[in-house]
């Protein structure tokens, strides 16, 4: 909402129709206008190359498993303008909660639910390396330590 309130055109993408409806309702209640679409962050054909000045990952990257992460980062790079910025909000580091520790695949850095990969929790350095390998420069990093797992905020720009 902050960006819309300050005059920016805002787009939101989520796989879940429920999340899109929730965002639309929040913006409508605040009397703000934005564009929300059900879509896949790993495949954004509705957007042109070099279209956005800023892309904000609202805690999405850690929800992606395996190669989907690289596809997402490649799409972000494709639609981000030169000198544009990419803000990432992602769970990182191994879990702290004993229940989650028992369900954490330390080799793949994945939190499992019912035996299936559910979230990716990479160590901070591995997350930074992954983002750099996708041709982003990391400009700033902030870690919030939480009782269940740590959360990284990265500000990046495309190389």
Language model features by range: what are they?
Residues 1-46, 64, 68-71, 75, ...:
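Class I (Rossmann-like) S-adenosyl-L-methionine-dependent methyltransferase catalytic domain
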Residues 56:
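A conserved beta-strand element that flanks and buttresses the S-adenosyl-L-methionine
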Residues 59-63:
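Short catalytic micro-motifs in class I SAM-dependent methyltransferases
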């Amino acid at each position: 909402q902050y960006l819309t309130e300050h005059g920016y055109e805002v787009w939101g993408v989520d796989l879940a129709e429920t999340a899109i409806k929730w965002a639309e309702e929040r913006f409508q209640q605040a009397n703000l206008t934005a564009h929300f679409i059900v879509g896949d962050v790993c495949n954004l054909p509705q957007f042109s190359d070099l279209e956005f000045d800023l892309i904000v990952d609202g805690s999405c990257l850690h929800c992606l498993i395996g190669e989907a992460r690289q596809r997402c980062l490649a799409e972000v790079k494709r639609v981000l303008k030169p000198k544009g910025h990419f803000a990432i909000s992602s769970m990182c580091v191994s879990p702290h909660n004993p229940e989650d520790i028992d369900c954490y695949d330390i080799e793949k850095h994945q939190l499992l639910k019912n035996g299936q990969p559910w979230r990716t929790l990479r160590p901070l350095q591995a997350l930074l390396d992954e983002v750099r390998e996708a041709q982003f420069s990391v400009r700033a990093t902030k870690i919030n330590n939480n009782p269940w797992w740590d959360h990284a905020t990265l500000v990046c720009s495309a190389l």
